[in-house]
């Protein structure tokens, strides 16, 4: 096989300079193709990191505004409900789409919200990361609804009550 290539090259009468020119083009093309593959992989990994960070931030804000001041178990339960809604029914695939779906969580309709901060924000971020990355076993599998104990929404009768944690009642 190699002798055929050599014979072909000799017929072209390009000599050593031609050989090196063609070799440089071939090697350069291969290098550019490989660089493109690795650059695409790096860009995809960066987009995935940004997507995950954005979803964790949305989940943390939801935990903060819905369950700040609740027992830790209640904050985890709110995060679980949020994650359970992802990809289900009227909700989309991203956590942010679930959190900001119209009417899904009361705080998203408020015009002025305090900037999250302090120890409560640190706890909310920790809870969000643990639930998002599934570092903790769910305590309310299948829970998709909850409400505060001081209200009785009409939809509550249609769903199975799972637990009361802090000032929230959770349903499947």
Pin down the residues of each PLM region.
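Hydrophobic membrane-insertion alpha-helices, especially the h-region
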Residues: 16-34
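Bacterial extracytoplasmic/cell-wall-associated proteins, especially those involved in peptidoglycan
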Residues: 2-9, 15-18, 36-172
């Amino acid at each position: 096989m190699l002798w055929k290539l050599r014979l072909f090259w000799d017929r072209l009468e390009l000599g050593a300079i031609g050989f090196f020119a063609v070799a440089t083009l071939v090697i350069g093309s291969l290098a550019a193709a490989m660089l493109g593959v690795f650059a695409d992989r790096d860009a995809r990994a960066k987009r995935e990191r940004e997507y995950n960070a954005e979803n964790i931030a949305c989940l943390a804000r939801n935990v903060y505004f819905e369950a700040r001041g609740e027992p830790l178990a209640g904050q985890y339960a709110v995060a679980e409900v949020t994650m359970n809604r992802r990809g289900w029914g009227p909700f989309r695939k991203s956590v942010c789409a679930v959190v900001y779906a119209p009417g899904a969580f009361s705080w998203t309709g408020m015009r002025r919200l305090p900037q999250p901060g302090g120890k409560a924000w640190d706890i909310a971020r920790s809870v969000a990361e643990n639930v998002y990355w599934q570092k903790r076993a769910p305590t309310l599998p299948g829970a998709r609804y909850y409400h505060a104990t001081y209200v009785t929404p009409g939809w509550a009768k249609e769903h199975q009550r799972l637990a009361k944690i802090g000032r929230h009642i959770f349903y499947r």
